[in-house]
Amino acid sequence: MEEKNHIYPIFDRMMTREDKEELLGQHSVMIWFTGLSGSGKSTIAIALERELHKRGLLCRILDGDNIRSGINNNLGFSETDRVENIRRIAEVSKLFLDSGIITIAAFISPNNDIREMAANIIGKDDFLEVFVSTPLEECEKRDVKGLYAKARKGEIQNFTGISAPFEVPEHPALALDTSKLSLEESVNRLLEMVLPKIEKK
């Protein structure tokens, strides 16, 4: 039967996620980093990917640079666009997961509702929320891109942590404060959590 909008489902004829995971020898999960700009999300994500790669595990990192320059290059930073940004990221992440690929996302994703939306799209059993809890003072001190300085001068509106709020996650799978933990320590804690979930026995 023809579905609405002329969409004909073919999912029942496609290779399954389990087939892909068997081929790759891994279980796919979503590792979702949230935290302030400059907290260390992307740095940890890249280091984690390298460690998993060394173990023969296939990963894909999604972050602001590769998403905003591509699939989301038509979105701005209004509240509506921020929600749509995360929705698209979650949908793309779901496709990677269904291909058996361990997916790592590093986005500020500043409130619980937006992260809950992502978890619901991806599937809560697959969604590991990692809160990079580095304090604002430390993030602002680093200010690698000069964004905090611009936000303090009013040159950037609705900047999370300065002129827009960040809601602390209620029940993250893991919290990492990079002002107290080294990169190696952060990655080791992640590996302790992640490896039992992704390695096929």
Curated annotation (Swiss-Prot):
Which InterPro entries does this chain map to? APS_kinase (IPR002891), P-loop_NTPase (IPR027417)
Family of this protein? Belongs to the APS kinase family.
Q: Please name the pathway.
A: Sulfur metabolism; hydrogen sulfide biosynthesis; sulfite from sulfate: step 2/3
Q: Say which domain of life the source belongs to.
A: Bacteria
**What is the name of this protein?**
Adenylyl-sulfate kinase
What does the entry list as the binding residues for ATP? Answer: G35, L36, S37, G38, S39, G40, K41, S42
Protein's UniProt keywords contain Metal-binding: no
What EC number(s) are associated with this protein in UniProt? Answer: 2.7.1.25
